[in-house]
Swiss-Prot record:
Family: Belongs to the universal ribosomal protein uS19 family.
Keyword Cytoplasm on entry: yes
Protein name: Small ribosomal subunit protein uS19
Keywords (A to Z) from UniProt: Cytoplasm, Ribonucleoprotein, Ribosomal protein
InterPro entries: Ribosomal_uS19, Ribosomal_uS19_CS, Ribosomal_uS19_euk/arc, Ribosomal_uS19_SF
Functional description taken from the UniProt entry: Component of the small ribosomal subunit. The ribosome is a large ribonucleoprotein complex responsible for the synthesis of proteins in the cell.
Native source organism of the sequence: Xiphophorus maculatus
Amino acid sequence: MADTEIKKKRTFRKFTYRGVDLDQLLDMSYEQLMQLYCARQRRRLNRGLRRKHQSLLKRLPKAKKEAPPMEKPEVVKTHLRDMVILPEMVGSMVGVYNGKTFNQVEIKPEMCGHYLGEFSITYKPVKHGRPGIGATHSSRFIPLK
């Protein structure tokens, strides 16, 4: 019975951003791309990218080009948490500053239209432990250590 079954080739879901696949996104101009983005990102691109943002966009392809084949590119560090992730940034490694350290972020196609800062958390999430002295009325009966 196993011989008669035809093995199905595994198919992976192809990435699309609002119905447009990544290859077409890369070929689009900024004006066409802006029509797909949300209002906040449209406004950002419409007002133009500043010099710092332009220099980041120049450094990312350079790092990708210098990387050996089948290897991840060198990390490009930046403080630009407000940079909109564009399709040409996909596949790059970016070190996003969170106020203390640079968090490495690998740009994936699903991140298009988001900001770099969304992927580098600026605070340490709270780990709730035992209550301290005077936290509640019942804490009077909690022994000290």
